[in-house]
């Protein structure tokens, strides 16, 4: 029986049953397996993929929608093509399918330099940049005098309200999964009001800090320091490059620059919400 051409292989929705196959695809491309993250994204978002007739996946990606009925925004991430099928138009075909399926919904994604030309070809525009930093956090110098504590169930309403103001869209289905997904979820308080929150979730040998929502840089610093004090793993996070003060601060405390990604959008000229209080995404794959 002849092997079907890549162009004829159907695109289907992925489910949590595809978690291991998605992790295999990550590994195939030299990425960490990140099974914990794949599980989170496949349950909170919509996965799309192409099955390989020889087993596994040819390609995959995940779309995370924000907004209860008509999404105000959708983030595309984890766009991967198996090495043996690279540079044959598979990623382009999958992306075109996703863009078409999302209709009029504004889209965003974080692009590596490798992926950016494809996204530009599809009509995405660069609207910002994020810097990935990683390392063991070493406390030093005057620390911000901002009170932080572990979040409780009673904080959820206030966290959701703050998050929607800052993110610019309803992320209830993401935020409510954080207590199970993350190893730490902490809030910053002033006068009984929550002025920021952050999570640290396990990813291979690191703890990823995200989301990081804070009233200002000093609150963001306090949240990072409080998360770092409660883990023996290196931290990793992706910080909007406009937050120069925070980037300088984390680098002075042991984190090093790993890479820059372009923040791109489709159907909107800039992301909704308040970037000045949005320091890091939950993951670059979900915004």
Task: Locate predicted features.
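Conserved active-site tyrosine of GNAT-family acetyltransferases
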Residues: 119-120, 124, 250
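Basic, Lys/Arg-rich alpha-helical nucleic-acid-recognition elements, primarily the DNA-binding modules
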Residues: 7, 13-14, 25-46, 56, ...
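Intrinsically disordered, low-complexity, positively biased terminal segments
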Residues: 1-6, 15-20, 52-53, 64, ...
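Conserved catalytic-core motifs of GNAT/GCN5-like acyltransferases
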Residues: 68, 106-110, 125-139, 257-269
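Surface-exposed beta-loop interaction hotspot
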Residues: 127-163
